[in-house]
Amino acid sequence: MTDKHNEEGKEKKLKLPSKMIIGKHVDSKKFKTSYFTSHNNSVTVEIKGGRKFSSSSSLPHKINTQISTIDEFNEKISLLKKAASFAKSEEYRSNVTNFSSTVEVTEQQTEAENSTNINLSEQTIKNNSHQSSSNTIETTQEKKQNDDLSSNITPVEAITQLEPNQKILQNQQNSSSISLNSIISKPQNKSSIENNVEFETEATSTKSSAIWTKKNNSAKPKKSDIYQMLDSDSKSKTRSFAAIKRARDKEKRKLQNNALTKKIYREVIIPDTITVNELALRMSEKLSDVMQALLKLGIKANINQSIDVDTAELIAISLGHSVKRTQDSDVENILHSDKDTQDSLLPRAPIITVMGHVDHGKTCLLDALRSTDVISTEAGGITQHIGAYKVNLPNNKSITFIDTPGHEAFSEIRTRGAKVTDIVVLVIAANDGIKPQTIEAINHAKAAKVPILVAINKIDAPDANPDKVKNALLAHNIVPEDLGGETLVVPISALKKINLDKLEEAILLLADMLELKANPNALASGTVIESQVDHKSGVIATILVQRGTLKIGDILIAGNGFGKVKRMINDKNQQVNYAYPSDPVKILGLSQIPNAGDAVAVVQNEKQARSIVDYRIRKAKEEQDLKVHNISLEELLKQASANQFKELSLILKTDVHGSLEAIVASINKIVNDEVKIKILHAAVGVINESDIILANASNATILGFNVKIDSTASIKAERNKTNIKYYSIIYDLIDYVKSAVSGMLSPIIHEEYTGRAEVRAVFNITKVGKIAGCYVTKGYIQRNSKVKLLRNNEVIFSGPLQTLKRFKEHTKEVKEGFECGIELANYYDINVGDIIEAFIVTEEKAKL
């Protein structure tokens, strides 16, 4: 048979050689070298590291292949095996001695299946791992023995992938040629690498056999052998798989880097306040770019500094991002999400706050109502803590009383008492009248829009004058009922329990008019009345339940702390499991001591509590950061001048938070131009070792109010001689601070004028200097006097005298009408006509 026209357009026949080699080297993990050898009229197909196939009668083949993957190469080997199997068939062997066959191979160059004849050549192997393969198979068979390979060999081009399911050989009976067709796809581009595998077999009529052997694959050929290509007249070297793979990886990285460098614009969620670092992370921008944008707005900030939402929005927009505002405070909405319906509201006990001036009988009144003796337990006989009590009345009704201190230092406590109350009972002593704290209580009640009920106490006193008190109330827009107004006024005596029943009736009447109701089935909420730290029980908070029912095990938020309610104790020191609206109770279980006046609320779970507390802490920090950032120039100058002041360092420890707050407020009112009071640490609890360490390091004084010192701290304080002061009455503590500040003040200097002298002559004395000859015109001049030298009514010197002489003798005093010699200390610019005034300096201890 003849092949189709080759590239020159001519017909060409190929002779069957005695030996056929399949390729030179195949670069894959599985196939290292593939070739055929002739053994005694048999053909052996040997694939190193793979398998061996032998046949006594086979068909000469030549395969040009471009291999992309190992699987595609395996398909080529499968094709060769099928060709060899056909060579063993009876039909082929019957005709093999009398004919020569040519297997024509076509190369598809276009999609319209145009073909050309391709001459057989020695194999050239090239491999491209990311492009499709092409194959051309051309076989020629002619019976001949021991012939060499034809030297007329040219490269084979554009061979495509073979499909394994198509027939490879077709048997044509009574014909002198056999055609092997392959499926050929489109030609590859110029960058494709051709892999040519030459397959030649020796055709004999002997019986065929298949031999499979395993070859040792341990020897790995060198790259120079594996990738060596054969050309018609010279050898050349191509790139290795590793090099191609590195090049492809480099290209991929380049594409990825280009994708990364392409800026992505985002929708940035910005809360009320945000740090510079967090803003940069949310925008995926460099910190340097964000800082530069801030500088353009005239803002100098570090990465941890907080900026407001408006500034953050300007930065985000300037960098090309869109902005979506959100509020972190949304987490607290769960505390107010449920609303009470009218049907869920039930009557509750009124909450009464007792207010008035100190020593007007507020606590004594509560003792009389509760039949207790609280006042005897108060230091100095005055109330220094806010207290809450529940009084059960004979008619199965109850009233909750809140007792507030009357001392001026406890203004904040009275303010809180007015805010949580329903009715203010203003206690005024009939023998003392309206005082400053009485007026303050009236103002607090009016500010809180709380009705006032006046109780004129001590009507049993000899000098009591209730009518005078009623008339004095008119000056503060409080008009009693008997004077035509709406304010209930009840004269009482707490000490002798006079008219206490009338006071209770007036309270209940006013409460009925207010229609006080609450929902007992809701989640509990209320207000912190007082808080403290106990060395055995931990944090204890006195709270007033204003809504819902508080139970043991509830998750409670109080200020910046939260916790599970472990125990509840009522005002009678009894442990209870439930607290209903208007009930005051002490609770244990909070993680952090709350401030008096903080709101408390029960939440569903610990996760909600933690998110709310984290928000509150973060908000407080951001507000502090903004406060520091927005400090004015005047404040900076004030701080700079404050550094020149003397400093009194204090550490304050109290039993409850209300007392701590009152003492700090009172100390801050002690202001002067020389001494600055610095409270290094103020907390609730006993004096501990860390307080001692801080006091020693800063030379501070520890002030303890109704607290003690623990044993470890006591030993350390005694060893280091730490200054610790203990007080149980707020008056004494404030007086000590004032005294300490006064002791640090510079004494007051007084100049007492004593006399005047006129300079009438100046004498230059060797080794002494200038001596002024003076005449005392007024008063007297003493040796220890301070003098001022005046010239043209201007002071040119002020200082002590060096010597005072009368003639040549030293003297202590020279009186008016006498002459004397005066030498000034280290000053010699004295002229005739100058005036010397003498005065005595006296010091007086400064007081606040």
Swiss-Prot record:
Annotated localization: Cytoplasm
Name of the gene this protein is made from: infB
UniProt-recorded name of the protein: Translation initiation factor IF-2
Compositionally biased intervals (Polar residues): 112-139
Binding site for GTP: 356-363, 403-407, 457-460
Region entry G4, spans: 457-460
GO cellular component assignments: cytoplasm
PANTHER family, A to Z: TR-TYPE G DOMAIN-CONTAINING PROTEIN, TRANSLATION INITIATION FACTOR IF-2-RELATED
Domain tr-type G, residue spans: 347-517
Source taxon at top rank: Bacteria
Organism phylogeny: Bacteria, Pseudomonadati, Pseudomonadota, Alphaproteobacteria, Rickettsiales
Listed InterPro entries: EF-G-like_DII, IF2_II, IF2_N, P-loop_NTPase, Small_GTP-bd, T_Tr_GTP-bd_dom, TF_IF2_bacterial-like, TIF_IF2
G5, as annotated region: 493-495
SUPFAM superfamilies according to UniProt: Initiation factor IF2/eIF5b, domain 3 (SSF52156), P-loop containing nucleoside triphosphate hydrolases (SSF52540), Translation proteins (SSF50447)
Predominant location category: cytoplasm
NCBIfam families xref list: IF-2, small_GTP
Keyword Cytoplasm: yes
